[in-house]
Design a protein with these regions (language model features):
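N-terminal non-catalytic structural scaffold regions of very large proteins
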Residues: 1-182
Length: 182
């Protein structure tokens, strides 16, 4: 028995207000109708302290670059300052469930939290595995690259390069053909 499904996509966005030098980092997760602040997602993954989250993102070389990265993260830290526990983060995320979803009509908060936990485990970086620490490491690496590109240290990835292409095996391609014909 083989299960075929569409690729899950997550986007990490860095937005800024032009007049102020404030940078917001937000993440768009499947089944949620709006972008969630970065530190809320980290807290939903089990990283509670802001220091621990910053250690996942920053290289910790004690260089000037670390200070620049911290300056870029300041507004994101402030966005999630009212979230103190993992349950608080999951409860915050339940308010943004898609209205087309069955669980958005549930009134029981524990059912919604279980559903959000399932989204965090299964739909957030599914290629990394089910362990929260692996997801935190990957999210930290992604945000690190985003911030370094914003500072001009990294260039954009070449989307046309074969290094950045997804290679689909013959089984997945046949499954996609069968799924399209249904």
């Amino acid at each position: 028995y083989t299960k075929f499904s569409y690729p899950k996509s997550i986007s990490v966005k860095l937005t800024s207000k032009e007049l102020k030098n404030e940078n917001y980092i937000k993440i768009l997760i499947p089944h949620l109708k709006t972008e969630i602040p970065l530190f809320v997602v980290f807290k939903a993954l089990g990283c509670i302290s802001d220091r621990e989250i910053c250690e996942y993102i920053i290289d910790n070389n004690k260089t000037e670059l670390d200070n620049e990265l911290l300056k870029l993260l300041r507004k994101s830290i402030e966005d999630a300052s009212h979230i103190c526990t993992q349950i608080d983060a999951l409860t915050y995320m339940t308010t943004y469930l898609n209205s087309t979803n069955y669980y958005s009509y549930e009134t029981d908060i524990t059912t919604k939290i279980k559903y959000i936990k399932n989204i965090v485990i299964k739909d957030t970086f599914p290629h990394v595995g089910d362990k929260y620490i692996n997801k935190c490491n990957y999210l930290g690496l992604t945000v690190n690259k985003l911030l370094k590109h914003h500072l001009g240290i990294y260039d954009l990835d070449d989307r046309d390069s074969y290094i950045n292409k997804r290679v689909e095996t013959c089984g997945i391609l046949i499954g996609n053909l069968l799924f399209q014909s249904i």
